[in-house]
Structures are given as C-alpha cells and as structure tokens.
Amino acid sequence: MNLTELKRKNSVSIYRCILDGINSTIPIAKTIGLSQLTVCELANEMVAREILDITKPKRNVKGRRIHYFQPSHKFYTAIIDVQKNFICTIGITPSGNVTERFDYPVNYLDKTVQQILSDHVIKKLKNCQSFKYCTSVYVLCDSNDSYDVGEGITVTTKERLIVDAIAHKDKAMLFEFNGKCLVSLYSHVYQPKVSKDELIKAIPFDEFRCYDGDLFEIFIDSIQRIATKRLEDVI
C-alpha cells in the first residue's frame, strides 16, 4: 500500500498519529496493521512534505484569491519564513485532521515580514487579515539579522523580538538552532473561541525538540503536539 492509498483509507488515524505525537503510534499502528517504525516514517514524511513544506510558492500565486480559514475550524497556525519571504497557514479540526493549508508570499501581508519584525511585532500581526483566525504564529529568521531601530541603535532579530514581547507584556517563546531563530508568538493573534490563558495551557512548549538536518523538521514535533495536545479540553 503506497502513501496515497494509506492516507485515503486511514486519513483520520494517520493524521491523528502525526498530531498526537510519537507515543500514539503504537496503538494506531496495531489498529491499521502497520509497524511503529512505518507509521513514524509516514508521519514524518507527511508532515515534512505535505503539511509543512513551505519552501516554494505555488505556481501562479500572484493575483489569486486568498481564502481565509472558516470559523468552523477549531485550531489555526501560521508559519513565517523570513529568509524565504513566505508564509504557510494550516487549519486543523478538533478531531486532529489537517483540513486546509494555504501558502502565499509575504507580499500579501499589509507589510513585509521585515517591517513587521522591526515595528511592534504583536500589533502588526494582530492587524494582519491573514492571521485573523490563527491561534499560533511562528517566525523563522536568522538570529543575527540586524535592524536599525533609530537613534543609531542596531539590534539583532532575536533581541528585537524579545524586546517587543516584553514591552507588550505578552507570552513569547524563543529557540535557536544552527544560527536560526524560531520565535513563537502564539498568544498575539485573535481567536474568539479560545482564551489566551486556555491557549497557553494547551501548548506544551517544554516538550519542544530540535532536529539536525532540514530546517522544517523542527515543526514535526512541535506542530503535532501543539495541534491536538489537550485541545479537546480547551475548546
């Protein structure tokens, strides 16, 4: 059975496996008759290639209509890759299914990512229509990229993001790996059905792990845990 057939016949179980984390693979593997290793490999491949593959914009993206997530969805996440000037948004249902994904360049935003980072991160993200329904926002950038903040003062991306988060008295988590900076701004955007406190409780960032190799592999673990970990208790 190839990956396409497996997804079609067992999409709920496989996506549940992906989003629940690696410990879920044993019972799911037994249920659908696969080994734990096979399920793990499929989960990694599906997440890396289908859910989080934001390395290239889609063809003919210029001028096409951007469809925003519908309020019926219960979880939304956005990933910003500063270096590639690209954004990926993902919609996830309460059952753990990844139902929608839209990729588009940052020129669809009100301002470029660079401008957002250098001018009050939280305020700009809140005001971006693209993030209207997102409960989770990640910013990927080079840790030592410099920005002129005026009066002859230059700060790195990491420093600026930390300062913005502290200044707005909001939650932010920052991780560094291989000269890259991953900042989670998960409570900075509007989502009407989940309160800030409930959302924070639902996101176990202490379980975050980084991987060597491809940059986007870091999301395999974080997204799968964030998406469904205790989510049913939150909604």
Residue ranges of predicted features:
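C-terminal regulatory/effector modules of DNA-binding transcriptional regulators
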Residues: 98-235
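Residue-level marker for well-ordered alpha-helical positions
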Residues: 12, 40, 159-160
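N-terminal helix-turn-helix
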Residues: 20-54, 64
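Short connector loops/turns at beta-strand edges and beta->alpha or beta->beta junctions
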Residues: 17-20, 94-97, 144
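Gly/Thr-rich phosphate-binding beta-strand-loop-beta motif of the actin/hexokinase/Hsp70
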Residues: 63-100, 171-188
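A short, glycine- and basic residue-enriched loop/turn
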Residues: 58-60
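Extreme N-terminal segment that seeds HTH/winged-HTH DNA-binding domains in transcriptional regulators
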Residues: 1-29
